[in-house]
Structures are given as C-alpha cells and as structure tokens.
C-alpha cells in the first residue's frame, strides 16, 4: 500500500524538505526494527515542549509559573495529542505491523 504523504503535509500546512524524516517519524518499531520513530519521538517530545513553553510565555508574559505549568501540561498530554492526531487522520499515515 502506497501512502500519499502530500495529503498530510497539506493538512498540517508544512512541506517536509526531507520526506524520509516524515516517513521515519511515522514508522512504528513493529514495522521496521532499525529505521523507526523511537529516537525522532524522543527529540520531537522535547521540541514540542520547548515550542509550547515559548508560546505560553509569549501569550501570558505576566502569568505565574504554576499557572503556566498547568496550561503546559494540558497542551502536551496524551489526550490533547490524540485529539490533534485524530483531527488530521494521522492513523492513515502510520506504518505499523498488522498481521492480518
């Protein structure tokens, strides 16, 4: 099955310079033991955290750290990320072993 990643790029309004990184980031370890998303996921989690923290500081420059921390936690948790993933049908682009 061939996946059209350009549709995903349109949904997120970003064109990847290196499409291989996109494919690797969507490849589960069960599909490819060597070239999968584990290290990219590790890095991506940190990048997401930094971007969210920076944006919160820009939007709420006078807010107390405790409030910012709660807002941050609500934005980077699994539930929020899952909702965003579903909204762009990310499951249609993930490579995972399926023994049907």
Feature names for model-found ranges:
Residues 1-100:
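RNase III-family endoribonuclease catalytic core
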